[in-house]
């Protein structure tokens, strides 16, 4: 099962996340101040929580942030400001069979498409 995740940050409204499962968008907006990287991490955490809530197994989490994917997989250094997100992910790991987190191009990230649709002009 593929689960797409993406986070965004807007100066006026703050952070937002989107997760796409089975073609359905799960969007959270107004998540307060933070950075674009915080938003990407929150999107991954949202995706893992949602997979557990939906009872999904053998999931692959797909996001377009190389930094977050690398930090989550332990293949990239996690900056001090984001260690709390890595710890939150580790706490969620028992909810999932295994955490398979992979990078996908931005143009292929269905969650990114969902966020972009929110702000079409």
Predicted regions and their residues:
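Short, conserved alpha-helix that lines the donor NDP-sugar binding/gating region
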Residues: 40, 44
